[in-house]
UniProtKB/Swiss-Prot annotation:
Protein name per the record: Ribosomal RNA small subunit methyltransferase A
Record's catalysed reaction(s): adenosine(1518)/adenosine(1519) in 16S rRNA + 4 S-adenosyl-L-methionine = N(6)-dimethyladenosine(1518)/N(6)-dimethyladenosine(1519) in 16S rRNA + 4 S-adenosyl-L-homocysteine + 4 H(+)
Family: Belongs to the class I-like SAM-binding methyltransferase superfamily. rRNA adenine N(6)-methyltransferase family. RsmA subfamily.
Molecular-function GO term, any one: 16S rRNA (adenine(1518)-N(6)/adenine(1519)-N(6))-dimethyltransferase activity
Coarse class of the protein's main subcellular location: cytoplasm
Region forming the signal peptide: none
Gene: rsmA
Amino acid sequence: MEKVKAKKQYGQNFLKDSTILDKIIQSMPNNNNHIVEIGPGLGDLTKNLVKYKDLTAYEVDTDLIGILKSKFAIEIEKGNLKLIHTDVLEAWDKLKNLHDGKYDLIANLPYYIATNIILRAFEDELCEHIIVMVQKEVAEKFTAKTNDKEYSSLGIITELISINSKILFDVPAEAFDPPPKVTSSILYIKKDMSKSLDKDFNKFLKACFIQPRKKLSKNLTTIFDKNIIFEIYKELNINDNVRPHEVSSSLYSQMYTKVKNGRNK
């Protein structure tokens, strides 16, 4: 069969290293959850996942859909694999949930939409575990804590929505075909299924970090009324000189609740 060329517009880098594939399988939680895979590519991870659990895979590339249907004809016929040809973000817009029961997201994500996919998985109340391949710098942002250099809105949201988050291991460029120009990491997040976040909370955090090295109050008063921010600082005993990376996730949550009760400029 003619070699399939990766398409840049879909951010395709096919994971081929069997050792890495095995390590991903070993990291799967021991539960009865369904599995959702986004961007199965040529099916190298899919082949391993479907041995253990039923699987729903979302693929946007028409050429790859044909290959996957042929490669997994038996699994599809048996009902072990459901292959959906669509853009996964559009699917989330229409369906709200990627599966009709509790599921774990396990995938080698395209770099260019990885952050958006993880944030949507946070919103999906049926998604419990997230085990995904992403660019190392992205994984570090999702797992960063207060005062870390990489600390941003992503780390804050992750800390508030999860029970556990960590980088399991790094993956070198040579594990892929074609090799990307960056190091990748496997990011693991176990969500706290009792928690959910206000959709506008992320917008609030982005405003807080719009100039990350400036004082937090400076960032906030460009969007919100100065008197409201002053009162919130006073109520929560926040130092006026504090920078965005020095504030804990729980304090950001308290600030947001109070800002919601105030008024925009």
